[in-house]
Amino acid sequence: MKQYLDLIKKIIKNGNSKKDRTGTGTLSIFGHHMKFDLKKGFPLITTKKCHIPSIIHELLWFLRGETNIKYLNENKISIWDNWADKFGDLGPIYGKQWRSWDTSNGKKIDQIKNVLKQIKEDPDSRRILVSSWNVGEIDKMSLAPCHILFQFYVLKKKLSCQLYQRSCDVFLGLPFNIASYAILIHMIAQQCNLQVGEFLWTGGDVHLYKNHVELAKKQILRIPKKLPELIILKKPQSLFQYSFEDFKIVGYKPYSLIKGKISV
């Protein structure tokens, strides 16, 4: 994925030194856009190894509407452990907002079910979107959502999606985010009897943490390999009935892992 490496190079060359919530410090740019044609391969970076189970299980966890790390830990996934309280709770983060957004009149909105209904019944709608940025509950979340809004677009029986990410950890987080939403597009396309189209990614504060810069410089020396292919082995009756075993990624031959420290 040359686009990803080009972004790293851009930040290293033009990034602004900024302070951040974690105290680590970043090199940051404001505003960046990338587009991935999902027909040309599954957009999982090859210039370092990514932990595929973490990507898939996290997405399934979001879709379950869960906000406790119990499911993740049962599947040996620890990517949210640093933000959980002693009971494993994270507050009303992504899963809660996707599946059970609280309204002022006491009702709950399942944004994912609404999206599925709209794609099937009104595919030309300009309102097929999901928001995680619930202003009234941000302070209750252990971590404010980074990828905050995604919108679907149907054209000629192909499903595309654009994501807006307000804050992006390019070295550790972005490869996961791109792959996760690509999987989601494949899942929803399958459920709605559509083909996959494009994934468009737009970032706000797009940054490298300063303790990742030298690691990123090592990564950009690697030449990207052919993208793998995502295969969904069966079609469940519902978007919410997929399991980890339903996904197979073929032809993924990445370079070795480059491990970076996460900033909490």
UniProtKB/Swiss-Prot annotation:
InterPro entries hit by this protein: Thymidate_synth/dCMP_Mease (IPR045097), Thymidate_synth/dCMP_Mease_dom (IPR023451), Thymidate_synth/dCMP_Mease_sf (IPR036926), Thymidylate_synthase (IPR000398), Thymidylate_synthase_AS (IPR020940)
Parts forming coiled coils: none
Subcellular location: Cytoplasm
CDD domains: TS_Pyrimidine_HMase
Keywords for this protein: Cytoplasm, Methyltransferase, Nucleotide biosynthesis, Transferase
One GO molecular-function entry: thymidylate synthase activity
Pathway: Pyrimidine metabolism; dTTP biosynthesis
Reactions listed under catalytic activity: dUMP + (6R)-5,10-methylene-5,6,7,8-tetrahydrofolate = 7,8-dihydrofolate + dTMP
Active-site positions on this chain: C146
Positions with a binding annotation for dUMP: R21, R126, R127, R166, S167, C168, D169, N177, H207, L208, Y209
List of residues binding (6R)-5,10-methylene-5,6,7,8-tetrahydrofolate: H51, D169, S263
Listed GO biological process terms: dTMP biosynthetic process; dTTP biosynthetic process; methylation
Cellular compartments per GO CC: cytosol
Pfam families from the UniProt entry: Thymidylat_synt
E.C. numbers: 2.1.1.45
Family: Belongs to the thymidylate synthase family. Bacterial-type ThyA subfamily.
Known function: Catalyzes the reductive methylation of 2'-deoxyuridine-5'-monophosphate (dUMP) to 2'-deoxythymidine-5'-monophosphate (dTMP) while utilizing 5,10-methylenetetrahydrofolate (mTHF) as the methyl donor and reductant in the reaction, yielding dihydrofolate (DHF) as a by-product. This enzymatic reaction provides an intracellular de novo source of dTMP, an essential precursor for DNA biosynthesis.
Assembly notes: Homodimer.
Protein name per UniProt: Thymidylate synthase
Source species taxonomy: Bacteria, Pseudomonadati, Pseudomonadota, Gammaproteobacteria, Enterobacterales
